[in-house]
């Protein structure tokens, strides 16, 4: 006589239910399987609700937060604050489905020179909103089937940063850097394949607009019979950034064409515009002439320009933000019970050096690391040094920093080596 099976969860026998599945240490009936599935589904939905936008910061609050970490770029801050607020407001609106009006998402295009803060903007916004964040380099992307990263691998990175919580990843932010580097070479469509240019732009279209993307859990190429994770990109905010070097000529050419005939005074005015003011005049047709396809431009409706950072901006970046570089080095030296001090003129010379190298804010850390290398190497082994002073001669003439001992004597670095 066959042994009667009982469900380990509800206790019902196999005669009382449709089916019972046996495992190594227990059994489960079809009714309990349904209840478990429902429980998992409801738990999954709460995971999506973990990112609650009921207390979403208002644009003014978002800008205030950006002010704490980013110097200058006021117009870009306002544009991004409104864009981010509207994006996440749109998500909650679409969830409620009060009416048939569906709000389309507005992805962002940031245009600005190297080191102007494009990546920092995206990182800071993700930190404020506590959403997963991923960075991709457009120059490494290729169309599916070619050597390089598939565009869908961007989603894999976001998933990894969300600890593979799909619901959280679907509310995240993706920053695609160097989008200008995948511009097609000419306005006319090429009959040859352009796997790292127009082809990548085409591949990005659906992803940025919103699609259900099937991605391999560990990235890489897709293979037959491979388990895939389904990720809906409809609510992911895409921020694309690029320097668009040389686009000023495209803008100027368009403006000069408009200002012909009797408008010679207007032409003169256009010619005298500096680079920053000229960039503020950018329009969609300029981006098309530069090499972005119109369809991609249409999916990046919010365009904002970041100005090139001036000397005074870089000095402020060194000292003012919450995580300013100088504050970071002060903290590092404190671990060795040493104070470090930078003179005002030293900060100016560091800023000038970054401008000369055309690296913007991005190059400030490299300059400081080079200046402080020997000090950071030897100071931990010297117990009597209390203070390090960096003046302009250390930056300009590569002189050794001034070292002060606990007895207020001054030493040179060579004295403690």
Curated annotation (Swiss-Prot):
Zn(2+) binds at residues 7, 10, 29, 32. GO terms for cellular component: HslUV protease complex. ATP binds at residues 113-120. PANTHER family: ATP-DEPENDENT CLP PROTEASE ATP-BINDING SUBUNIT CLPX-LIKE, MITOCHONDRIAL (PTHR48102:SF7), ATP-DEPENDENT CLP PROTEASE ATP-BINDING SUBUNIT CLPX-LIKE, MITOCHONDRIAL-RELATED (PTHR48102). This is ATP-dependent Clp protease ATP-binding subunit ClpX. The keyword Transcription does not apply. Residues 1-48 form the ClpX-type ZB domain. Pfam families: AAA_2, ClpB_D2-small, zf-C4_ClpX. Belongs to the ClpX chaperone family. It comes from Francisella tularensis subsp. tularensis (strain SCHU S4 / Schu 4). One of its GO terms (biological process) is proteolysis involved in protein catabolic process.
């Amino acid at each position: 006589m066959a042994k009667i099976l009982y469900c380990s969860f509800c206790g019902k026998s196999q005669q009382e239910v449709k089916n019972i599945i046996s495992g190594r240490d227990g059994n489960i009936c079809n009714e309990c399987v349904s209840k478990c599935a429902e429980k998992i589904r409801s738990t999954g939905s709460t995971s999506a609700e973990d990112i609650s936008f009921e207390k979403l910061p208002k644009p003014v609050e978002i800008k205030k937060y950006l002010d704490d970490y980013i110097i200058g770029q006021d117009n870009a801050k306002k544009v991004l604050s409104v864009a981010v607020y509207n994006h996440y407001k749109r998500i909650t609106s679409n969830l409620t489905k009060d009416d048939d009006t569906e709000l389309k998402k507005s992805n962002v295009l940031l245009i600005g020179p190297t080191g102007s803060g494009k990546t920092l903007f995206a990182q800071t916004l993700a930190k404020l909103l506590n959403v997963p964040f991923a960075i991709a380099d457009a120059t490494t992307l290729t169309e599916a089937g070619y050597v390089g990263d598939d565009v869908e691998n961007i989603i894999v990175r976001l998933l990894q940063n969300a600890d593979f919580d799909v619901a959280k990843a679907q509310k995240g932010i993706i920053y695609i850097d160097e989008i200008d580097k995948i511009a097609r070479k000419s306005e006319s469509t090429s009959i040859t394949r352009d796997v790292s240019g127009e082809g990548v732009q085409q591949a990005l279209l659906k992803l940025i607009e919103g699609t259900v993307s099937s991605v391999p859990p560990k990235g890489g190429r897709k293979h037959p019979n491979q388990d895939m994770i389904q990720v809906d990109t409809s609510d992911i905010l895409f921020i694309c950034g690029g320097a668009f070097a040389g686009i000023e000529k495209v803008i100027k050419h368009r403006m000069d064409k408009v200002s012909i005939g009797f408008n010679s005074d207007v032409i003169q005015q256009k010619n005298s515009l500096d680079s920053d003011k000229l960039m503020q005049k950018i329009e969609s047709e300029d981006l098309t002439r530069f090499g972005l396809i119109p369809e991609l431009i249409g999916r990046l409706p919010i365009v904002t320009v970041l100005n090139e950072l001036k000397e005074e901006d870089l000095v402020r970046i060194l000292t003012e933000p919450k995580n300013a570089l100088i504050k970071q080095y002060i903290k590092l030296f404190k671990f060795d019970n040493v104070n470090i001090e930078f003179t005002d003129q030293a900060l100016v010379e560091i800023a000038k050096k970054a401008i000369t190298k055309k690296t913007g804010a991005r190059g400030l850390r490299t300059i400081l690391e080079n200046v402080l290398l020997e000090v950071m190497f030897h100071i931990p082994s010297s117990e009597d040094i209390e203070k390090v002073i960096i003046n302009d001669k250390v930056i300009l003439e590569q002189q050794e920093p001034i070292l002060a001992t606990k007895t207020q004597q001054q030493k040179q670095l060579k004295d403690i080596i």
